[in-house]
Amino acid sequence: MRNIRLYTLLALLLMAGGVMQAQITCWDGSVAEAYAGGDGTTGNPYQIATAEQLALLAQQTNTGSGGNACYILTDSICLNGSEGYSWQPIGTEEYAFTGCFDGNQFTIKDMYITNAGFSGLFGNTLNATVRNVRVTEAMDNNVNPQGADGLVVGKATNTNIINCVSMGLMNGIASKQGGIVGHFIVDTPEADTIFLKDCVNHVNLYGMLYAGGIAGYSEITNGVMSIEHCVNLGNITNGVMCGGIVGAGSFSIRYCDNYGMVSSNSISGGIVGQRDDFGEIVFCTNHDKASIQGEIAGGIAGAARQTKIAMCANRAKVTAQGDSNDWICAGGIAGADGKISNCYNRGDVECLVLYGQPEVVQMGGITGTGGNVVNVYNTGAIIPPENPHTNNAWYGIIAAGLSDDPTVDNWYWFGEYDINPYGFDWPYYLVPGSCAFNEGASATTWILDEAQYGTTDLTEALNLGAMNECIWKEDEDLTNDGFPVFGAMPPVGLAEQETQLFDVYPNPTNGILFVETRRATSLPAANEYRITNLLGQTLQSGRVGGEMHQIDVSGLPSGMYLLNLDGATVKFVVK
């Protein structure tokens, strides 16, 4: 049975014609006297049907006379998008939004921001919930070097942000900049978990200090933060610490994907730029065209510190570049540090010395310099600089440098290399249970040069090394060029409960989506399916039946969609 990651990736919906079915009247700059209905309770939230009523929420919140109830959009809104109609974000430093807001899958378009303390649809939220918000065609020109910018929320404290989408331009200046939220803070009793989940960013970011596709900077004082099922599609450049999902901070990140290029002046990672302390990054992927570049650069994390990185994959090129006195590190999974297990790298790892004499150059297929590295494989090439201009230059197929007393085991690499295949720890030493592998008898089998755990099959050896026979599986669908992929991944996305009754693959797809039942019996022959965009509009429907069925989705534009079938819903992406 195929357990496929059922979520996100590539361009969303609003690119398709006819997304807005009705003509929307844009904001005239005024403020409504009342909401369209409701009493502000959870069961009967205030109804917001016009831009003027949304401006009423901003006015009440920012003057301390409201913003502490529940609100719901009942129609799409246009905020005019011009200099004469600059949006004042909901919530200020003095008066935060403390209620619950449901965008109800409607769109808020043409938001224009020029002068705000915290920039976004919401400026500052506290103990709040923001969900189902679609910000599109936004223009953020706010300049506040000490501030926080996010198209959905600027600064969010103890705020659950769920199922939000950002599209537009962020041309402003802020120290913390994220496509969804600029500064994400958790300060609650330890039993509480705050979620940032099911969000997608399309915005290109030009960071000043911290920049992330989903969150610029995340911070935990007390409590638990979980960032999960999020996708970044925007490119991120210029910041000091940049990541496809989070620029830097404290967090737990699970089931996230990056498709955007990440380039910084210092530390870059496909998922995270820098982790401040202990944490975890699991079941995350940096995809093919999402190249990573920085002085310290990693396909998953730039500077991982004590972070656990497990079941993660990088498929893009990683380039570390620097000049005089720089410490240059590059790794397919982590540029530096981290506790890495059950991961693989498919991207080339390159180092460029721009000029002068760097202090250190370290390059590895998994990590430039790290702590624990266990049960991993690398197929990417290691491309050293033509002249490192330093005697402190080390290269490794898996790791160039290791910390004191590391845990290392089961390193596998594809083909033959001229560089040293062993771990470097002053001096080089042979890592236990490690060797090269080459092609087997089929496109999905790979043979170890030396038997490990009594087998020469790479996939079997990886599972034995993981002490779990389900973590790795053969790439039956050839989505990874036949190299082993992760197998036992819990169902994710909208249908993540044990009751999910079907799988879809490949995901993303180029045109044909296969549907396979998890039932003990086949699907009913006349079971109806429905494909919608994220606004809930039906784009395609039909009937499927049997143990396996295929649906032709080649007529859909590139983007993310929902497949509704047999009482469950899963996300899939068309490339």
Positions of predicted regions on the chain:
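Bacterial Sec-dependent N-terminal signal peptides
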Residues: 1-24
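Generic anion/oxyanion-binding catalytic loop in active/binding sites
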Residues: 11, 43, 550
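Generic marker of residues within folded, mature protein domains
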Residues: 12, 63, 356, 476, ...
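Surface-exposed repetitive/solenoidal architectures
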Residues: 23-492
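C-terminal outer-membrane/trafficking sorting elements
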Residues: 495-575
